[in-house]
Amino acid sequence: KICVIDGMVGYVGGVNLADEYINKKERFGHWKDTAVMLKGDAVQSLTMIFLQMWNVDERGVETYGRYLTPKREGLRRELGYIIPYADSPFDNENVGEEVYFHILNDEKKYVHIMTPYLIRDNEMLTTLIRAAKSGIEVIIIMPHIPDKWYAFVVAKTFYKELIQGGVQIYEYTPGFVHAKVFISDDD
């Protein structure tokens, strides 16, 4: 989910709009989610990701320049860069999956994953297990209370193989984890 305000501030992540998402009403226990607020040049990338999907089924050519703000000079960069990415309906590249493979194959200390829907192909299963067996701490946090029973059942079928391969799996018991988080080494 993407929300961009005047090209200056962007939000990405779990920004659902209903009482259950702010825990005013409980459908699946306590709802846990994440979102990130961005400012600066990274907001331009979020804007382009949003616009690429906007009216994707129409054949017209859109000029996006009117939605972009001028590049701002003088932003602090000593802490690093933020590069938003997304998969696209216009090609067969799985950008997100490739980023995850790169992280799992490159990290030295840990990879912590939080996801409500652990539905993985064999390549991802193998990569997760290989990372764990190489000494990287691989932790996956899943919901204990599902919102989609079929996705929950499918996810459970991977538990045994992952645990035997050294991956640690935990379930959030007070409610539902809707967050999609992939965190790796601090440096």
Task: Please tell me what each predicted stretch does.
Residues 1-187:
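Charged, low-complexity intrinsically disordered terminal segments
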